[in-house]
């Protein structure tokens, strides 16, 4: 979660993207570039991936992201980071710094700096080639 001022909350989990109709699988929290992003829940950093220079369009749109595995196997995902301050395998507690929000048009963030936060029911399924179902974060993160 961005620490400090959240200037607005964008599309929710049930919203579809304008133009493409793709589902939005998280919530966008807008805050100034460079704002510290903190862990919503305690867990273990499962992966830190930098998709900014990837050839895969989905990875490019995600930019730099961090996945934290929390209790019950759920994944908390933080996309559009300018830098990550954690490494894979690291344990984090709620409120620990994960990274910082990227500037606009960097790290797949679009026109305004924000962190895209999502909760997934489970980790990546190699057979389905997909992550677990998205869960509305407001029901999981109190």
Predicted segments, located by residue:
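Acidic, glycine-rich catalytic/binding loops that coordinate metals and/or anionic ligands
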Residues: 1-2, 84-96, 113-142
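Surface-exposed, glycine-biased beta-strand/turn segments
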Residues: 1-65, 94, 103
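Short alpha-helical segments in extracytoplasmic peptidoglycan/chitin-binding modules
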Residues: 18, 78, 98, 117
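Conserved beta-strand positions that form and line the central face of beta-propeller blades
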Residues: 28, 77, 100, 134-136
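Short histidine-centered loop motifs in beta-beta connectors
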Residues: 32-33, 38-39, 72-95, 123-124
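Zn2+-dependent peptidoglycan hydrolase active-site motif and core
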Residues: 40-85, 109-116
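A short, conserved strand-capping beta-turn/loop at the end of a beta strand
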Residues: 96-108
